[in-house]
Amino acid sequence: MVEWTDSERAIITSIFSNLDYEEIGRKSLCRCLIVYPWTQRYFGAFGNLYNAETIMANPLIAAHGTKILHGLDRALKNMDDIKNTYAELSLLHSDKLHVDPDNFRLLADCLTVVIAAKMGSAFTVETQVAWQKFLSVVVSALGRQYH
């Protein structure tokens, strides 16, 4: 079990309280699909992903980005049991969707870039430490069924 300090909890809660899920979710998923184009293979049913412009304009990608952020909200609300919170989602991604678990880390990295850009100087080293810890726990939980 991961132990969280009061400061870490406060930082992560603060980040989420200021997030526009639609904007941040869309930008993060789009960035992942553009920067790491091999991740597009999991989104074949989402239509044309031919170039950056079509990805950025794709409403299905935008909606899925928002869904991802709401999924992270579940981790925020269950910080003391993220592993079990994501057990079913991990199973779905491993057994049914066959998503390479490294892609969770790539998306987490893109999410960090987008949030850091949005927060600017408020994204301090202390903030990044807490945020990276949170995302590392989430990524580990999502990859749990692969081990």
From Swiss-Prot:
Cellular compartments per GO CC: blood microparticle; haptoglobin-hemoglobin complex; hemoglobin complex
CDD domains in UniProt: Hb-beta-like (cd08925)
Keywords, in A-Z order: Heme, Iron, Metal-binding, Oxygen transport, Transport
Protein origin, superkingdom: Eukaryota
One term of GO molecular function: oxygen carrier activity
InterPro entries: Globin, Globin-like_sf, Globin/Proto, Hemoglobin_b, Hemoglobin_oxygen_transport
GO biological process: hydrogen peroxide catabolic process
One Pfam short name: Globin
Residues holding heme b: 64, 93
Annotated tissue distribution: Red blood cells.
Residue intervals of the Globin domain: 3-147
PANTHER family: HEMOGLOBIN FAMILY MEMBER (PTHR11442), HEMOGLOBIN SUBUNIT EPSILON (PTHR11442:SF7)
Function: Involved in oxygen transport from gills to the various peripheral tissues.
Family under the similarity heading: Belongs to the globin family.
Other information: Hb 3 displays a Bohr effect, which is enhanced by organophosphates, and a Root effect, which is enhanced by ATP.
Subunit structure: Hb 3 is a heterotetramer of two alpha-2 and two beta-2 chains.
Protein's UniProt name: Hemoglobin subunit beta-2
Species, as recorded: Boreogadus saida (Polar cod)
